[in-house]
Amino acid sequence: MRILAVDDDPVFLMLLEHVLTAIGYKDLRTVESGAEAMTLLRDPRQKFDCLLLDIDMPGMTGIELCRRVRALQDYHDTPVVMITAMKSLDFVEPAFRAGANDYVHKPIDELEMRTRLRMVGDLIEERRRRASVESRFSTDHGLPVINVRFDEPVALSEAGSVIDYLALENYALTLGRLRLYGHSVLGFKVTNAESIFCSTDGIGYIDTMANVASVIDGALKSCNHLIAHAGRGEFVAMISQRTDLDVDLLQDEIDLAMDRYAHLHEALGIPLPDVTVGRILHTGFFTRTSVSSLFKEARQSVRDVAMVR
């Protein structure tokens, strides 16, 4: 794994290099500003597998740098881990909105960094495997292709509040139990997602799920929220307040918005997505519900609603 680390503190970069070397990551390049990083990233002779970005830098912040990185075709889905010494979590959500995949605190803990980079490595290997399959198919048939599994939480980027599922889990983990108590979680399900998946190719399926994400994003516009596609046509939304939205009204708004795509889907021969809204969930103040369990509960909730709808 070739890593680029960006931080305006040269002493921290030396310490980071020491930690990374100790856990087996020796191919590291460091720079001290966002401008230097962008120069490297635009150089076709350079290629990095993972970016470690300090959030609080003078001039171009790490969040702005992350946003610019995501605009580069070669780094659209490269894993980005944000690093910061700031204690406030006010900037965490903007970092994930900008495209970050994960987040760690200074001072760097060796075990935490090892765990984060192991997850990054797994993500890189999965994306390399998919790219290899897509490349072979494209070479054999001369057609663009995206290799997608139905149960895979494929990344969608068309809507402003949509982030990767892993990133949403990582964001929720940064909140801690107290802050998580102040959030609401809501599941959505495209009940005919498997029919859509079978009726089109990977590009068509991702485009359709992206349209659904945009509709959900619009329906939740009155709330500060983040959305992720969890696979199998299911979505999880985190709302940054304890809310009791009228789920029936939300369902009606989504149905109405999806109807606007009816003519397009008819022309393409792809079933129009049938989206179901689940129940709004909250964590208890004294409970120790894990983030993964909370998200699973949200997905199960919408499955239950879909069965009786």
Q: Where are the model-predicted features located?
A:
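Active-site residues of response regulator receiver
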Residues: D7, D54, T84
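Conserved acidic segment of CheY-like receiver
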Residues: M1-L20, L51
